[in-house]
Structure formats: C-alpha cells, structure tokens
Amino acid sequence: MKLIVGLGNPGREYAATRHNAGAWWVVRLADQLGVTLKADGKFHGLCARIGQGESESWLLNPQTYMNASGRAVAALCRFYRIQPEQMLVVHDELDLPPGVSRLKLDGGLGGHNGLKDIVAHLGTREFWRLRIGIGHPGEKHAVVNYVLQPPRKEEAALIDTAINDSLEVWPLIAEGNYQAAMMRLHTQKQS
C-alpha cells in the first residue's frame, strides 16, 4: 500500500462530524506509527511519509472539501507515481451500522461524493476502500444533515470500536495480505 487517504472535511466546524470518520482513522494510524501529518500545499492536504525506499508510503488527509477530494489524491498519486490499486481510501459508510468496518477493492460509490470525485480524477474505481460504518438516518433527504453532524455518544463509541478493529488489521493491509485482513476484519465480533 503506497497511499492511505482519510476522507473528511477541513475545519474545526467539521472535525467531529460523521463524514470525517476516514480522516479520524488516518490521524489514529499516524499516531500509532509515530508520525505527524503536516500541511502540504502541493498535495492540498495533511501528509506524512511512512517507511523509506521501496517500503515508502504516504498518509493523506485532503484539506479540500469532501466533494473535491480527488484533486488532492490525484496530485499525490501523479507526483509519486502511485497506481490506484496501491491506494487505500478510508471513508464513512452510510450502509454499515456504527461499529462495523469493511475492506474491499473496487465497487460502487454509494452516493459518496468524496469517492465520486476521486474516481473522476483517477478515471477508475480500482482502489481499496476501508468503509467505516456510521449508520443511515433512515430517510434519504436527511443524509446531508446526518453526515455533517457529530455522532451521538453511543454511536461515537461504536465508530471508535470500528476504527480500533480496523487499525488492528493495518499490518496485514500494509504487507499486501488483503484476504487475511478482510477475513479477520469481517469475522471479528462487531458491536
């Protein structure tokens, strides 16, 4: 894995919202790895390098708004010649309940504007996704307000569990052992 992207919106007013679950995950991974995400205007985001040489990878939290995430992702991919299939995009997922996370390659976009913009910039859906469940408000018209609100206390605890569970399989993802990562993540007892 050469690039790990955490989707979210920049700014304090969005920091605690459900839509930032992907960004939360990347911040936690950076902490776990002992690196600091730093602003990089060239890549329109907060970045950190992990590893060196052949094992070099990048963490990126775009600081564009969600709907323009592809600009940041494409800039870093072009500069470091990273292929889409070498990338993991971590994002909030309405179709999974809080407490559940799932890893997959390719697939639909589920109406997620951050994913849509990445696909528009890269011209492919062939990249890995780590989907962090945030639940669904029940009504389609309520989705925008729902994702831009902080989770309730009990939901926040479940989302935190999903982030912890998926961080436990990070070493498998990092070494390219995706099947083992999926097996472990998808069969863990999820709350």
UniProtKB/Swiss-Prot annotation:
Question: Would you tell me the Gene Ontology cellular component terms?
Answer: cytoplasm
Task: Summarize where tRNA binds, as residue positions.
Answer: 14, 65, 67, 113
Q: What class of enzyme is it?
A: hydrolase
Q: Which GO terms describe its biological process?
A: protein quality control for misfolded or incompletely synthesized proteins; rescue of stalled ribosome
Q: What does this protein do?
A: Hydrolyzes ribosome-free peptidyl-tRNAs (with 1 or more amino acids incorporated), which drop off the ribosome during protein synthesis, or as a result of ribosome stalling. Catalyzes the release of premature peptidyl moieties from peptidyl-tRNA molecules trapped in stalled 50S ribosomal subunits, and thus maintains levels of free tRNAs and 50S ribosomes.
Instruction: Please name the InterPro entries in this protein's record.
Output: Pept_tRNA_hydro (IPR001328), Pept_tRNA_hydro_CS (IPR018171), Pept_tRNA_hydro_sf (IPR036416)
MF-aspect GO terms: peptidyl-tRNA hydrolase activity; tRNA binding
Active site per the UniProt annotation: 19 (proton acceptor)
Q: What's the short name of a Pfam family annotated to this entry?
A: Pept_tRNA_hydro
Q: Which reaction does it catalyse?
A: an N-acyl-L-alpha-aminoacyl-tRNA + H2O = an N-acyl-L-amino acid + a tRNA + H(+)
What is the name of this protein?
A: Peptidyl-tRNA hydrolase
EC id: 3.1.1.29
Q: Where is this site: Discriminates between blocked and unblocked aminoacyl-tRNA?
A: 9
User: What's the source species' lineage?
Assistant: Bacteria, Pseudomonadati, Pseudomonadota, Betaproteobacteria, Nitrosomonadales
The record's family statement is: Belongs to the PTH family.
Assembly with partners or alone = Monomer.
Q: Where is this site: Stabilizes the basic form of H active site to accept a proton?
A: 92
Q: Which Gene3D superfamilies match?
A: Peptidyl-tRNA hydrolase
Query: Where is coiled-coil annotated?
Result: none
As for subcellular location, the record says: Cytoplasm
Recite the UniProt keywords alphabetically.
Cytoplasm, Hydrolase, RNA-binding, tRNA-binding
Work out whether the entry's keyword set contains RNA-binding: yes
